[in-house]
Amino acid sequence: MAKMIVFNEEARRALEKGVNTLAEAVRVTLGPKGRNVVLEKKFGSPLITNDGVTIAKEIELENPIENMGAQLVKEVATKTNDVAGDGTTTATILAQAIIREGMKNVAAGANPMVLKRGIEKAVEKAVAEIKAIAKPVESKEAIAQVAAISAGDATIGNLIAEAMEKVGKDGVITVEESKGFTTDLEVVEGMNFDRGYISPYMITDPDKMEAVLNDPYILITDKKISSVKDILPVLERVVQSGKQMVIIAEDVEGEALATLVVNKLRGTFTCVAVKAPGFGDRRKAMLEDIAILTGGRVVSEEVGIKLDSATIDMLGRARQVRIKKEETIIVDGAGRADDIKARIAQIRRQHEESTSEFDKEKLQERLAKLAGGVAVIQVGAATETELKDKKLRIEDALNATRAAVEEGIVPGGGTALVSIQKALDNVETPAGDEATGVAIIRRALEEPLRQIANNAGYEGSVVVEKVKSLPVGQGFNAATEVYEDMIAAGIVDPAKVTRSALQNAASIAAMLLTTEAIVADKPEKKDAPAMSPGMGGMDMGM
């Protein structure tokens, strides 16, 4: 296919046009008085959202060169979302501002490579300053504030803070769609996995269709149990102790299953069999997790323990095990705290070293199950359109909160970026284009605050100048339209979100400024469809 090649100023201007088209669609959503954007869906109702990355992902432009510019800014939003989970609109606005100011200077004769060096030095200094002014997030109130600002809803903020309090900062918090109108929090305490009882005859509570065993012994094995002979020695010891028993195995079938069911129905002995969770190597790892949590051992021939030689000392213990049709919950396992901590540290290391997103997600789940349970936020709304928007907002708020716990918080509402401008005075650069690069970042740092003010119906430049004259930490509260201490007012941003937005925006913008030629596919001219015979003058007897 033939290519078109565009050079110099013409190339940069076309890219900038694409950048501006995407950024203008996204920037209207910033701040407490930001508007929504409606996205057409080929199937189902349109999606109404104010989530920057969701809007950016939908945008494809007709002109191939302008589309390249839009795709580059889309990468800014996507990368920021991947790293920090929020701040995508801020990142897009920063990228647009850096590109706009940079283009002016390149057009006036500045050397793009020297400008890029100045931009990089300024960003390095700004990031160090963001880290320096960040305050750690420890209290439930601070967590609620971060989540409320991100979601634009105090109720959601409180819900996320409550979820984090219950499952811990490493705990898994999932967001699911509910059938009702209200948004609720459901906490599953202890370790849970998605396998239930093998036979419904094993239930102890017919009303709830579940088996609840208090203070049971837990046999954990990766073997398939078909013959009762294999487990008879350990079964006899458990029966003598008068306790109940849970068997977690690859499967329990045939004679072994029949024996357990008959004894349960006769009231002789309660034993519930559950299939082991996961598959392959992940199953072995999860069984090991359960063993450490309950203070037992995995009975496996791989470690030299045969099923018929298992002793009662190898069994795990827990305060309670609840088993439903498709879920098992182990509450308060009897494992040693030091062993559990060591296992958590090991999984955390694996999580850091893993390059697969799927593996990371599964390791995070295992981490949470060992660390303290799973919280589920059930999102409810009157219509499907509202439900989708609400779910996106809650997911954003959850990501922002995790980022805040990780690296702390800074004053929100674009205030932190304006306040770190002063730090750029200390960047050592030779006069000329490198100093201009620093000035470009200094000017771009004002842009998010300017846009928040514009969206609230104020003159952005006036608000920016006013905030610059205020003490550090004070800014413009667009929700109440007053100037106040942002952290005291609960208007905060996660430092990680602010840092990632600036770094990603500057990275893509600097690359774009140094572009001197663009190669793109030539759009194909589509021939007009041939008219069908007899349609010429539309006479045909009419």
Swiss-Prot record:
* Entry annotated with the keyword Nucleotide-binding: yes
Q: Which reaction does it catalyse?
A: ATP + H2O + a folded polypeptide = ADP + phosphate + an unfolded polypeptide
Task: List, alphabetically, the PROSITE patterns matched.
Answer: CHAPERONINS_CPN60 (PS00296)
Q: What's a single GO MF annotation on this record?
A: isomerase activity
Please give the GO cellular component terms listed in this UniProt entry: cytoplasm
Q: Name one Pfam family in it.
A: Cpn60_TCP1
Its keywords, alphabetically, are: ATP-binding, Chaperone, Cytoplasm, Isomerase, Nucleotide-binding
Sequence positions that bind ATP: T29, L30, G31, P32, D86, G87, T88, T89, T90, G413, N477, A478, A479, D493
Matches recorded under InterPro entries: Chaperonin_Cpn60_CS, Cpn60/GroEL, Cpn60/GroEL/TCP-1, GroEL-like_apical_dom_sf, GROEL-like_equatorial_sf, TCP-1-like_intermed_sf
Q: What is its EC number?
A: 5.6.1.7
Gene Ontology biological process terms from the UniProt entry = protein refolding
Compartments (UniProt record): Cytoplasm
Q: Which domain of life is it from?
A: Bacteria
The entry describes its oligomerization and partners as:
Forms a cylinder of 14 subunits composed of two heptameric rings stacked back-to-back. Interacts with the co-chaperonin GroES.
- Give the family from UniProt: Belongs to the chaperonin (HSP60) family.
What does this chain do? Together with its co-chaperonin GroES, plays an essential role in assisting protein folding. The GroEL-GroES system forms a nano-cage that allows encapsulation of the non-native substrate proteins and provides a physical environment optimized to promote and accelerate protein folding.
The name on file for this protein is Chaperonin GroEL
Q: Which organism is it from?
A: Heliobacterium modesticaldum (strain ATCC 51547 / Ice1)
